Regions:
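Small-residue packing motifs within transmembrane alpha-helices
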Residues: 1-6, 97-103, 107-110, 114, ...
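Hydrophobic alpha-helical transmembrane segments
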Residues: 1-19, 153
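Short hydrophobic alpha-helical membrane-anchoring segments
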Residues: 11-18, 121, 160-163
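Flexible, active-site-adjacent loop/turn segments at secondary-structure boundaries
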Residues: 17, 91, 135
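Predominantly long cytosolic amphipathic alpha-helical stalk/bundle segments
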Residues: 24-113, 117-131, 164-196
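Pore-lining and gate-forming transmembrane alpha-helices of multi-pass membrane transport proteins
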Residues: 135-162, 166
């Protein structure tokens, strides 16, 4: 259980640092991209800087790159590019969340397991002749129940942070989808219409 608590604490700290709003979806990033692409498509250096800036930047850069690479890109294809880039970004944002959820689920079970083993030991150590001390038995049971309490002490915060981080990722996902939706018509102005 000590290992579970150390891993859970490390994951919580890592996710708190990684899921900051400024690092994932900066507030003015979409407006900056629209401003930069108002008259023409940016150079590859600018697009690379955009992609390196944040998860939202990676998604927006994927759309800009696709229009630069294929000027006859259809709106449907551009939306597919944004969708694929969004999936990759969301997958990165969800990193370690399943591990944190597993710890939240497993910690109380490990505590319960420790309690059961402790109870077996306590009752197994009692004299079969009936000369057992009730106070000693009660003390042994209370010590065994500490395992369950420790499991819950790990599980409750881990579950709360898991839910918090899940909500953050869901919020960032919506933000990225909305930004991509706003950028699609803007980028389609640069797409060359194919003559059929």
């Amino acid at each position: 259980m000590i290992l579970c608590s150390i891993v859970a604490l490390a994951l919580v700290i890592e996710r708190l640092v990684s899921l900051r709003g400024a690092k994932v979806a900066p507030d003015k990033l979409l407006d900056e991209v629209i401003s930069i692409t108002r008259t023409s498509l940016p150079s590859s250096d600018v697009v690379n800087k955009l992609a390196a800036s944040s998860a939202l930047g990676q998604v927006l850069a994927a759309g800009v790159r696709s229009v630069v690479a294929e000027p006859r890109l259809s709106e449907r294809a551009l939306r597919a590019v944004f969708e694929n880039a969004g999936r990759v970004s969301v997958h990165r944002l969800e990193r370690y969340l399943n591990t944190l959820g597993t710890i939240a689920t497993a910690a109380p079970l490990l505590g319960l397991f420790g309690t059961v083993v402790g109870m077996i030991e306590i009752f197994g150590s009692q004299a079969p002749t009936g000369g057992s001390n009730p106070a000693q038995l009660a003390h042994g049971i209370s010590v065994a129940l500490y395992n369950t309490a420790f499991g819950l002490m790990i599980a409750i915060p881990a579950l709360m942070f898991y839910r918090y981080f899940r909500g953050r990722v869901d919020g960032f996902t919506v933000d990225m989808e909305q930004a991509a939706e706003r950028l699609v018509p803007h980028l389609m102005r640069f797409a060359v219409k194919s003559s059929a």
